[in-house]
């Protein structure tokens, strides 16, 4: 009777080791949460053009987990790659009519962190528009 239990314990240990090894291997291939250069578009209601520029955003992989058994009484918190330290820059949009403030301020990521998503400052949706999407006429203004 002692042998089947011993084999089961060894199998569980091997299975656990394989799962841990695969998790570590997978995470080494995924880009970490860090500032990256990205082309983004900024626009403002009332101005006929959007400005396409280069800035630094937070992008990359954060370890998350989701329970196998979900309960309506529990809340799942997913960590996302988001801003830790940020600086704001202001640009002037071209061809804004009189009476419309042509200035717009956008964030520049200085450092990033895996934390809960703050909807006030981040787009936490599953499928969002591309960062360089414009609803109005595009004008390139590529700066870092």
UniProtKB/Swiss-Prot annotation:
Alphabetized InterPro entries for the sequence: Cystine-knot_cytokine, Glyco_hormone_CN, Gonadotropin_bsu, Gonadotropin_bsu_CS
Record has Disulfide bond as a keyword: yes
SUPFAM superfamilies, per the entry: Cystine-knot cytokines (SSF57501)
Highest taxon of the lineage: Eukaryota
Cleaved signal peptide residues: 1-27
Subcellular location: Secreted
CC annotations in GO: cytoplasm; extracellular space
Residues of this chain annotated as glycosylated in UniProt: 37
Disulfide links within the chain: 33-81, 47-96, 50-134, 58-112, 62-114, 117-124
Chain residues in the propeptide: 143-144
Coiled coil spans: none
Molecular function GO terms recorded: follicle-stimulating hormone receptor binding; hormone activity; lutropin-choriogonadotropic hormone receptor binding; protein heterodimerization activity
Record keywords, A-Z: Disulfide bond, Glycoprotein, Hormone, Secreted, Signal
SMART domains: GHB
Primary site of residence: secreted
PROSITE patterns linked: GLYCO_HORMONE_BETA_1, GLYCO_HORMONE_BETA_2
GO process terms (BP): G protein-coupled receptor signaling pathway; ovulation; positive regulation of androgen secretion; positive regulation of estradiol secretion; positive regulation of gene expression
Quaternary context: Heterodimer of an alpha and a beta chain.
Similarity comment: Belongs to the glycoprotein hormones subunit beta family.
Function per UniProt: Involved in gametogenesis and steroidogenesis.
Name of this protein: Gonadotropin subunit beta-2
Organism: Cyprinus carpio
Gene from which this protein is expressed: cgbb
